[in-house]
Amino acid sequence: MAKVLQENDKAKVCEVIKNSNLRGRGGAGFPTGKKWEAAMKQNTDQKYIICNADEGDPGAYMDRSILEGDPHSVLEGMAIAGFATGADSGFIYVRAEYPKAVATLITAIYQAKDNNLLGDNILGSGFNFNVELRLGAGAFVCGEGTALMESIEGKRGMPRNKEFRTTVKGLWGKPTVINNVETYANVAQIIEKGADWFKSIGTEKSSGTKVFALVGKINNPGLVEVPMGTKISDVVFDIGGGIPGGKKAKAVQTGGPSGGCIPTDLFDTGLDFESLKEIGSIMGSGGMVVMDEDDCMVDISRFFLEFSVDESCGKRSEEHTSELQSHQPIS
């Protein structure tokens, strides 16, 4: 943060983040630097920075771990985003079901203010940036950016029509940058070590590392941070220790309810945005659910369809009807 404020060059910060090829870790993989640059170019009286910590995919707890273990990396990333885009106000939207993360964030915000890293005139630079917490009530749909903004505004968490990008018209109709926890946690390291350092990790199009929550039928469940492009087989067998009881692996599910179940004959696929898309799955926020030979894929499909039906906002009747119809044949 000190380096950014000393150089006092918003465009340079956006350029460094663009050159690093940092992409959103919330699932979509949109280039972070392009998003910041778009918000920076908006000429308006107010802009906002939002951290999406509404982690809702079954089995995923990457954001919770970062918020509990290193909240200052997220706050610093948000403040740098605020400087780069011209925003002076930020919000962290976090699940109320994460009480330890909430308590840790509250403490971290006070610590940052006490050390002049948040608030007014940060480090004597004239830059002001404040962060507020907003607690989500557990609705999965609020993980969608515009639904999250509706919730912050005190409304029902319903996705908006995408007439404008949120960098043009977001929170309270003002330009807004929204990234997830892991994305912000990477920012300070990129500023400190440089774009080339970050690009040296991972693949050409998917730079850096990714945190995955390795859960399910696995000997060593837990959080795993690996370079983008690491093979699924390396994560499941080398890091995860394989399947309990010497049983055979059947599949790995990535991408949450909207993702896909990847069979063992595709375990040589790299964990990066492009490779997963090629085989019909997605990165998602980082949940990896391992299934063994005893798991029934019909039951797995039923579970995710039921989850999607239960958590649907119901805004588009044809969408909800389609989900229900998909669910009926396998009930």
For each feature predicted by the language model, list its residue ranges.
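Gly-rich Lys/Arg/Thr-decorated short loops/hinges at beta-loop-alpha junctions or inter-strand turns
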Residues: 1, 51-63, 166-171, 213-219
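Histidine-anchored nucleotide/phosphate-binding helix
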Residues: 70-84
